Amino acid sequence: MSSQVFCISTGQTVSVCLPANEDPVEFPGAFFTPNAKKPTVYIKKETDLSLLRSHVYDGIKDGSVTVSQINSYLYMVLKDIREKPDKNWTSFGVELGKKNEPMGIFDLLNVEDVKGKELDKKGQDTRLPGDDLWLPTLIFGLYRVSRATQVEYKKTLMTNLYAQCKLRTKDAEEIVDETAEFFNAWANDSNFTKIVAAVDMYFHHFKKSDHAPIRFGTIVSRFKDCAALSTLSHLQKVTGLPIEEVFTWVFNKSVQDDLLRMMTPGQEIDQADSYMPYLIDMGLSTKSPYSSTKNPSFHFWGQLTAFLVKSARAKNALVPVDIAYHELTTAALLFAYAIGRSSELEQRFVLNGKKFTKEKDSREDNDTTPPSERNVVVWLAWWEDIKHEITPDMKAFAKRAVERVGDIRVNSVAEYARKLFA
């Protein structure tokens, strides 16, 4: 897309444009259009589970296991799990399960059998079926560990993972060192990630299943690359406003554009049992429209607002690059200040008919005292009255929010706010 400008000195009309250096987003709904179909996973369906189990155990122990063997093993040990949905289960027009009829994990996928290298039969049939109680938990847990970036957090995850394995059976073994990295490559295999997503999607639906704790490792697949959606949900919670009222506090076009894209209809964002939360690992999208990368203005504005209203979680959010910091910061401060200066406290129950009646506020035309209500129209009128100038009290409000924070992450929202307001 290009626009035209006129050069005064030469009299030329110049078409101006920017390089198209970003891939377009892909919405999950597009995967199912025009034909509603399940995502396809390619798996070598082994016939000898006993031999496969031994290969996988030994391969995980020495780091030589292939992701193809992992996929085959997971399929073999999980395919017979059955649960009955309490209602018909559909997503994007795809029928996944019928009410009160048994269904399995792999009913969420179209499974294609593929040929592959035969397993070496050199006397490796040494493991017992009891391993199937804990090996899948270990495998999925290693996927979660592979996505962690901080060393100490990885160590904590490994400790908790082995605890989960022990809960499955006391015979679980600690066969992977906390410094191992061979499993990091599994995330690059689309068949493996589809299995991860299907397992999490299945047990998110059947939360009471005896096998549901396996989600310790798979849960990171849900809403992967959807940080901006998480920001929206978090902002709604910490402000205490209905979601539609949060939208009325959007004053920046870049934030508006991000939200319009995220709210593209027909994507099943608000359907808990949809394929949508697994758009990345299911292969529905290669570029999420809900990531912080694709929605940097909204993500920054939302996280800074949340931080200023004392959200502990928001302090570690990373600050995006190349956004309109000044405008977004001003808008976030105004929103947070309005939330911090006002409340929606009122009597909710009465006894013996004794109800407090609030007198209507009467503001003078030249009154520059901040409003005591959360009506965005009233606040914008006040903002006009003070000539769009950040007041000393607004600065003090932001400074108090910054001063309460201890350790601060580099390039985080908290670091940005401290440099600006402290």
Swiss-Prot record:
Residues 320-390 are annotated as: Interaction with the phosphoprotein (N-RNA-P). Residues 180-320 are annotated as: Oligomerization. It is found in: Virion; Host cytoplasm. Residues 1-180 are annotated as: Interaction with the phosphoprotein (N0-P). One of its GO terms (molecular function) is RNA binding. Homomultimerizes to form the nucleocapsid. Binds to viral genomic RNA; this interaction contributes to the virion assembly. N in the nucleocapsid interacts (via C-terminus) with the P protein (via C-terminus); this interaction allows to package the L polymerase in the virion and positions the polymerase on the template, since P acts as a bridge between N and L. N(0) interacts with the P protein; this interaction prevents the uncontrolled aggregation of N(0). Interacts with the matrix protein (inner layer); this interaction contributes to the virion assembly. Interacts with the L polymerase. This is Nucleoprotein. The gene is N.
